[in-house]
C-alpha cells in the first residue's frame, strides 16, 4: 500500500531521517523529518495554473506546533490550537526567506508549504527540522525549485562551535545562530550573540554551512528515489527589443528620477515615467496582459539603470558614497510622561521609541511545547501605513512587524541587566513614523536610547545598520545604510547590530544564488565602521544611562528572607500577604527561594510593606523596645501584637508602676503602645512591659519599683510531727479519710464535652496561646 522512501544520516550526534510515501500522499510533496524523537511533517501543494492578473509569486508558509507533540492539552476555553503564536510566525518566516529566492523569475503559481510538529522530545528543536522538511518536500514535488537547501543551528560555548545545541547550551553559551544554505552558498542568517567579534561570527556561519551541505546531500539522495516529474515552465519571451524601446522612451526620465534625493519627489517622477510607458503600450494596441508584462520590463529597466550607476559611477540614489551614512538626529526624553523615550531620525527613516517599566505581574506568559514560561523583556514594532505615505490596513501586527520586532529584540536582549540586578519587566515600543530603509535598525538605536533614558542599566549602547549589495558577475558594491529602493533593487539585505565591543545580532537575506566569503567579510568590516559612526551620533543625545528612574515609573525593592519564614509572610490561604497589600497599597511578590519584591510608585508604601514583612520575619530581642498594638484584653493583662506578626503578654503588673485594678480602665483594643521585651521562654512565648517605656517618646525609663523581697519560710520542723506521709498506698489527707472516687456516674450531672475548635468567641488569640 505504501511506497516508502527513506534516507538517514548521522548529523550533530543524532540520526536525521527523511521519509516520504507514507503520509500526505495527495500533496505534491510531503516529507516527514525526524531528529531524535522530534518529528515534523511538511506538505507542499502548488496550483497548476496562474490566477488572472497575478503579477507576484504567492508563496505561503505555515508552521504549526501541535500541543500533542509534547503530550500537552492547549490552555484556554476551546482546548485546541488557535491562531499562530509569535514563535510560529517567526519560524514560518524562517522557512520562507531562504526558499523564496530559489524559484524562477516569472513563476506566479500559488504554493502552500505547511509544516506541523508531530512529536517533540524537548531536546531537538523543531524549527530547524521544519526548514529541512520544507526543502525536501519542495525538492521532490516537481515544482521549479532551484534547491535544495539545508539548515543548521550553531552555538558557541567555551570557544567552540556546537551544531544543533540544546536550549541549555544556548543559554550558557554566547551565540544562537541559524543558517540556511545551498551546497554552494549561504542564503540566510539569523542570530543573537553576546557581543562577539566579526571573526567569530564569520566562523560560525562557515561552520553552519558545512553542516548544511550534509543535509543537502541527504535531500538529493531522497529526490533520486522519490522525486516527481519536473514541471514544464514556459520560457520567457525575449524582451530585449522592448527594453531598448523603453530605454529610448523613458530611460532619461528614470535616471533623472533616481537622482532626486527626496523620496516623495522621486516616487512621483517614477510614476510619471511608468504612466508614459503604459500610454505607449496602449497606443501600440497591446492587450492588458501584454501591458502588464511591459510594466514588469519597466521595473527591470529601473533596476538596470540604478545598479549600473552604482557599479560604474559609484553614485547612489541619494548621491551618497557607498560607505556614507545618512544624517542622524537623536533626542531623548521626547515624551514627558513615558518612563523613557527617544526620537531617532536617520535620513527619511524615523521612530518614536518608548520604554515602560513594570512589575513581575506584567511579564508576558508564553504557552508552548516546553510548557508555560514568562518573558520580562518585550519589544513591539509598529509600522503604520502613513510612515510611507500610503493608505492601508492599520491594526493587529502582521508577520513583517513581528519579525522586525524580534530582530530588534535580539539586538538589545544581550545587553540587558539580569533580573537580580534590575527586577523590572521592560516593554519597548518602536512606532515607525517615517520609513525609507532599515526601520528595524532604527528601532534598535531608538530602543537603546529609550532604555537608557528610563534608567535601565544596560551594559553598553547598541547601534544597528542595514547593508546592501549590488553584484554583477565579478563586480560588486557594498552599500552602507541602504534606502528602501536600494533594498528592493539590490541583491542582499544584511543587518548588523552591536555595541562597541562586538555584534549582538546579525540577519542576512540573499536574493541571488549566494555570496562568497570575500564579500561576506567585506560587508562585516564595512558594517562595523558604520555602527561605530552611528553609535557616536547616539552618544551625543545621551552618553550614559540615567542614574534615576522616571518619577512616573514604579519602584521595586527586594529583600531576602529565610525560606522557613515564607509561610509566615504568606499566611494561611494567603491571608497575611493579602492584608499587607491591602493595607499598604504596595505589590508584594515572593518566590520559592525567599526573594521578596515590593513594588509601588509611592516609596512610603514600599517602606510600610518592607517594615511589616521585616517585623514578621525578624526575631524579637530581649531588652529591645518595639511599637505594638493591643489586640486582646484579659483579666490578668493585655496581649500586644508587635513586629507585625508577633504577640506578647503585658501582665497587669507591667502596665503601670501603680496598681491597676481593671485592665480595661487603662487600655483598649486597637490602642497603640510601646513595649519592652522582658523575656522569651524556650517555647517562644514573650513577656512584655509597658511601665518601663515612655509611651510618648518610646524611651526606656528607669525601673523605680523595688524588687520583690523573697518570702521567709522559717523552720518547717521535722517530718515526723507532720502526720503520716502521703504515698501511693495511703489515701488519707491530714488524718481524714477521702471519700469515694467520683467516676463517670455520681451526682455531678452530665459531663461537658469540649469542642475541638475551642470556644466559639475567643477574640484575637495570640500565636503562643495556640500551642
Curated annotation (Swiss-Prot):
Q: Which CDD domains match?
A: KH-I_PNPase, RNase_PH_PNPase_1, RNase_PH_PNPase_2, S1_PNPase
Q: Name one GO molecular function term.
A: RNA binding
Q: What is its EC number?
A: 2.7.7.8
Q: Does the keyword rRNA processing apply?
A: no
Residues involved in Mg(2+) binding: 487, 493
The GO biological-process annotations, alphabetized, read as: mRNA catabolic process; RNA processing
Q: Which cofactor does it need?
A: Mg(2+)
Give residue ranges for domain KH: 554-613
Please give the catalytic activity noted in the UniProt record. Answer: RNA(n+1) + phosphate = RNA(n) + a ribonucleoside 5'-diphosphate
Q: Which InterPro entries match?
A: ExoRNase_PH_dom1, ExoRNase_PH_dom2, ExoRNase_PH_dom2_sf, KH_dom, KH_dom_type_1, KH_dom_type_1_sf, NA-bd_OB-fold, PNPase
Keyword set for this entry?
Cytoplasm, Magnesium, Metal-binding, Nucleotidyltransferase, RNA-binding, Transferase
Biased composition of type Basic and acidic residues is found at: 702-771
| Compartments reported by the entry | Cytoplasm
Pfam family of this protein, just one?
PNPase
Q: Where would one find the signal peptide in this protein?
A: none
Q: What residues does the S1 motif domain cover?
A: 623-691
Q: What does this protein do?
A: Involved in mRNA degradation. Catalyzes the phosphorolysis of single-stranded polyribonucleotides processively in the 3'- to 5'-direction.
PANTHER family given in the database record: POLYRIBONUCLEOTIDE NUCLEOTIDYLTRANSFERASE, POLYRIBONUCLEOTIDE NUCLEOTIDYLTRANSFERASE 1, MITOCHONDRIAL
Q: Which family does it belong to?
A: Belongs to the polyribonucleotide nucleotidyltransferase family.
Q: What is this protein called?
A: Polyribonucleotide nucleotidyltransferase
Write down the species. Answer: Sphingopyxis alaskensis (strain DSM 13593 / LMG 18877 / RB2256)
Amino acid at each position: 500500500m505504501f511506497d516508502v522512501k527513506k534516507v538517514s544520516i548521522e548529523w550533530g550526534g543524532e540520526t536525521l531521517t527523511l521519509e516520504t510515501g507514507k503520509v500526505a500522499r495527495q500533496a505534491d510533496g510531503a516529507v516527514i523529518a525526524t531528529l531524535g524523537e522530534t518529528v515534523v511533517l511538511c506538505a507542499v501543494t502548488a496550483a497548476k495554473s496562474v490566477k488572472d492578473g497575478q503579477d507576484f509569486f504567492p508563496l505561503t508558509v505555515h508552521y504549526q506546533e501541535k500541543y500533542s507533540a509534547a503530550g500537552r492539552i492547549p490552555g484556554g476555553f476551546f482546548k485546541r490550537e488557535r491562531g499562530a503564536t509569535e514563535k510560529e510566525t517567526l519560524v514560518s518566516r524562517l522557512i520562507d526567506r531562504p526558499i523564496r529566492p530559489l524559484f524562477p523569475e516569472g513563476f506566479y503559481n500559488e504554493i502552500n508549504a505547511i509544516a506541523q510538529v508531530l512529536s517533540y522530545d524537548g531536546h531537538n528543536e523543531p524549527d530547524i527540522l521544519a526548514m529541512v522538511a520544507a526543502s525536501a518536500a519542495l525538492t521532490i514535488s516537481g515544482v521549479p525549485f532551484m534547491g535544495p537547501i539545508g539548515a543548521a543551528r550553531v552555538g558557541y560555548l567555551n570557544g567552540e562551535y556546537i551544531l544543533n545545541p540544546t536550549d541549555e547550551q544556548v543559554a550558557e553559551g554566547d551565540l544562537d545562530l541559524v543558517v540556511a544554505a545551498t551546497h554552494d552558498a549561504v542564503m540566510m542568517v539569523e542570530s543573537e550573540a553576546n557581543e562577539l567579534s566579526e571573526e567569530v561570527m564569520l566562523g560560525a556561519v562557515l561552520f553552519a554551512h558545512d553542516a548544511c551541505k550534509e543535509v543537502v546531500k541527504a535531500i538529493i539522495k531522497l529526490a533520486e528515489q522519490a522525486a516527481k516529474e519536473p514541471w514544464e515552465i514556459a520560457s520567457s519571451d525575449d524582451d530585449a527589443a522592448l527594453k531598448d524601446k523603453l530605454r529610448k522612451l523613458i530611460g532619461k526620465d528614470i535616471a533623472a528620477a533616481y537622482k532626486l534625493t527626496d523620496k516623495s519627489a522621486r516616487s512621483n517622477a517614477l510614476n510619471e515615467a511608468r504612466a508614459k510607458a503604459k500610454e505607449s503600450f496602449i497606443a501600440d494596441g497591446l492587450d492588458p496582459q501584454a501591458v502588464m508584462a511591459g510594466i514588469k520590463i519597466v521595473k527591470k529597466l529601473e533596476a538596470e539603470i540604478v545598479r549600473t550607476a552604482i557599479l560604474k559611477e559609484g553614485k547612489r540614489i541619494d548621491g551618497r558614497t557607498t560607505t556614507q551614512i545618512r544624517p542622524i538626529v537623536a533626542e531623548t526624553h521626547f515624551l514627558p510622561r513615558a518612563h523613557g523615550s527617544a526620537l531617532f531620525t536617520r535620513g527619511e527613516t524615523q521612530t518614536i521609541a518608548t520604554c515602560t517599566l513594570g512589575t513581575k505581574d506584567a511579564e508576558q506568559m508564553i504557552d508552548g511545547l516546553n510548557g508555560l514560561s514568562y518573558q520580562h523583556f518585550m519589544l513591539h514594532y509598529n509600522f503604520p501605513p502613513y510612515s510611507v505615505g500610503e493608505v492601508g490596513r492599520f491594526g493587529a501586527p502582521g508577520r513583517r512587524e513581528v519579525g522586525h520586532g524580534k530582530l530588534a529584540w535580539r539586538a538589545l536582549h544581550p545587553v540587558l541587566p539580569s533580573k537580580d540586578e534590575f527586577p523590572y519587566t521592560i516593554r519597548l515600543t518602536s512606532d515607525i513614523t517615517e520609513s525609507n530603509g532599515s526601520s528595524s535598525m532604527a528601532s534598535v538605536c531608538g530602543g537603546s536610547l529609550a532604555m537608557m533614558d528610563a534608567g535601565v542599566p544596560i551594559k553598553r549602547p547598541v547601534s544597528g545598520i542595514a547593508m546592501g549589495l549590488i553584484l554583477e558577475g565579478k563586480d560588486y558594491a557594498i552599500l552602507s545604510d541602504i534606502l528602501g529602493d536600494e533594498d528592493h533593487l539590490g541583491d542582499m539585505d544584511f543587518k548588523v547590530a552591536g555595541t562597541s565591543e562586538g555584534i549582538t545580532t546579525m540577519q542576512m537575506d540573499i536574493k541571488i544564488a549566494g555570496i562568497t566569503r570575500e564579500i561576506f567579510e567585506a560587508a562585516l568590516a564595512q558594517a562595523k565602521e558604520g555602527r561605530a559612526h552611528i553609535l557616536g551620533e547616539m552618544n551625543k543625545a545621551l552618553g550614559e544611562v540615567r542614574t534615576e528612574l522616571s518619577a512616573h515609573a514604579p519602584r521595586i525593592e527586594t529583600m531576602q528572607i529565610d525560606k522557613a519564614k515564607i509561610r509566615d509572610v504568606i499566611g494561611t490561604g494567603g491571608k497575611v500577604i493579602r492584608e499587607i497589600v491591602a493595607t499598604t497599597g504596595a505589590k508584594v511578590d515572593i518566590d520559592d527561594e525567599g526573594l521578596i519584591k515590593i513594588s509601588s510608585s509611592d516609596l512610603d508604601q514600599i517602606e510600610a510593606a518592607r517594615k511589616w514583612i521585616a517585623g514578621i520575619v525578624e526575631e524579637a530581642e530581649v531588652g529591645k523596645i518595639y511599637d505594638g498594638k493591643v489586640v486582646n484584653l484579659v483579666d490578668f493583662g493585655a496581649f500586644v501584637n508587635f513586629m507585625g506578626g508577633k504577640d506578647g503578654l503585658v501582665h497587669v503588673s507591667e502596665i503601670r508602676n501603680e496598681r491597676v485594678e481593671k485592665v480595661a480602665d487603662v487600655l483598649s483594643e486597637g490602642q497603640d503602645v510601646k513595649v519592652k521585651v522582658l523575656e522569651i521562654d524556650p517555647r517562644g512565648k514573650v513577656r512584655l512591659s509597658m511601665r518601663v517605656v515612655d509611651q510618648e517618646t518610646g524611651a526606656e525609663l528607669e525601673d523605680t519599683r523595688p524588687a520583690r523581697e523573697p518570702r521567709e519560710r522559717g523552720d518547717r520542723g521535722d517530718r515526723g510531727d507532720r502526720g503520716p506521709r502521703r504515698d501511693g498506698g495511703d489515701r488519707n489527707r491530714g488524718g481524714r479519710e477521702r471519700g469515694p472516687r467520683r467516676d463517670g456516674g455520681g451526682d455531678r450531672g452530665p459531663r461537658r464535652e469540649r469542642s475541638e475548635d475551642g470556644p466559639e468567641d475567643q477574640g484575637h488569640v495570640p500565636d503562643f496561646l495556640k500551642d
